Every structure is written in structure tokens, then in C-alpha cells.
Amino acid sequence: INDIASGYLGEAQLSGYKIVRIDTTSTNDTESYVAGLWHHDRVGNRLKVFVFLHDVDCDEGHPTEVAVGSHLLNYYRTDAMGASRFADEYVRNNYEVAKLCGPKGGGFVVDTHTLHRGAVEGSLARTVIVGEYHSIGKCAAMDALKLGLPCPSGDQFLV
């Protein structure tokens, strides 16, 4: 995975990881789980690696959904979280939407500059390990410039 990340981002490093669980009751709406809204992560290109800790069903398992090809967009404002959210109707009318699901031990790699969401719809819980890769020096430069952007994400265990 390190070679994939460096091939895509230039020299890259794993900056952290976290475990994410979407329950069927407490996070079945976008008010309690804001990552259920279509969004990009406000930091330009970075990769997240998702590893399924159990089977993730495509319809009922809260799969991550991505708007295919949206990683090519240029965003002119990234300072506020609200500016990174997109209406479901807009995304579905303008992009092919892919559901990222699969068996335990499987997973995927996604550029979080891509419009994506964790589906809030579903009757089965989803638990994944998420690793985050950035170009070496990118987060330090953002911090030095006091940009206040989530690089690395603030809710992970740093490596």
C-alpha cells in the first residue's frame, strides 16, 4: 500500500489510522453522522485505505459511496466544512455512484478529494479500519501556514 500511495501522491507516508463504526440506530441519519453527506475532505489529494472487519453488504451494510471521476474537480473554497458538502440530487444527477462493499478482510483505497459519503441507509452495522496517507511534508506545511484544515484528520491515532 505504501508503494501505491507514493505512486499516486509522490513520496507519501501513513499519518494515522482509526476504527470507524456506523451503527444501525445511532447513526442512521446525517445529523448524527455528518460523513453521511456527500463531501470531499478539504485537503486536496490524500488517500484513505479502508479494511473491512466483517462483510460489508452493498445495500444494507452502510457502504462508502463515491462519485466516480469527481477527484478531478477543483474546489475554490475549503476552509469551512459546509463548503465541502454537496446535495445528494446533484451528485447522483452528475456522476456515476459506486458502492464500495465486500467481504471481511477486503477493502479499498480512495482519494478523499473525490466526492464520497458513508451511506446512512442500511440495517447492518459497518466497522472498518481507516488508514490515512499524505504527501510527506504536506500536513506540516498546512500547519505552518495556519490553514486550519484537517491534515491529518484530528480523530485518528497518529503513526
Predicted regions and their residues:
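Short, surface-exposed loop/helix-turn segments at secondary-structure junctions
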Residues: 33-37, 81-93, 144-148
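Short histidine-centered beta-strand/loop micro-motifs
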Residues: 34-41, 100, 118-121
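Non-heme Fe(II)/2-oxoglutarate
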Residues: 79-81, 113-159
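Conserved double-stranded beta-helix
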Residues: 1-66
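Double-stranded beta-helix
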Residues: 57-115, 138
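Residue-level detector of short, conserved catalytic/binding motifs and their immediate flanks
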Residues: 47, 106, 127
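Histidine- and/or cysteine-centered catalytic micro-motif in compact active-site loops
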Residues: 41, 52-56, 69-71, 113-115, ...
